[in-house]
Amino acid sequence: MRIKILLAVGLLGALSLSASAQEESQGVTPEIYYLMSDFGDGMVWFSDQGPAQGKMNICAEDNSLRYLDKNGQEVVASSIDNVVKVQIDTAVFIRNEGVFYRIYPVSDEMAVAVRRDLDIQRDAQRGAYGGYSRTSSIREYSTLYADGVAYQLAKSQKYPFTVSETCFLYTGGKIVSLSKRTLRKLFPQRKDAIDAYLKSDRSLPDKLSDVQAFLQRLASGETL
């Protein structure tokens, strides 16, 4: 299989240089702003051509694919409509409806797919006492659970932001919701156990580690 080098001009359409990381991310740490903590050895798979490789990362704010050119400059791929899969180091991402999901295998047939949503509130205005009008000044990350989603609230150096990570399922080549209906369909032999679990005033897990453990118990026949 012939592998193209991602740095070839035109491979991903027109390319544009990004702003500096500090300027663009408005003080949000790389671990939050990107789906990987650093640019790593990556491979991109396309729907209409062979794979390509290079040093790359994925931006959580706009789901853009970023990579480093031969001078170490961060570059934004302006057209990635034909990208279906990305691997950076050992992490695998599936692109679905314009969003990258990180894949965490649970079995040969199923994986947890995690989507990160980052909202940098650039329109927030400073209040009279130096805070921001859209959120309080939070120095440490804190977790807020709402609608089954874990939200991390924080104040960046320039603007407040929120970041959430939501767990889905990846099975049969598709991203599907983590819901009672989906689980009953995927585990028909465990319908009664799923119903009993939810009727006992418990909700489906939303943290990655808890979702993985829950699916493993479902698959093995263990008590939920």
What are these regions (language model features)?
Residues 1-25, 214:
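Bacterial Sec-dependent N-terminal signal peptides
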Residues 8, 59, 219:
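Residue-level marker of positions within ordered structural domains that often coincide
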Residues 24-74:
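N-terminal secretory signal peptides
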Residues 52-176:
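Aromatic-patch recognition
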Residues 151-218:
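A short, solvent-exposed beta-edge/loop patch
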Residues 218-224:
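A cross-kingdom marker for long, charged
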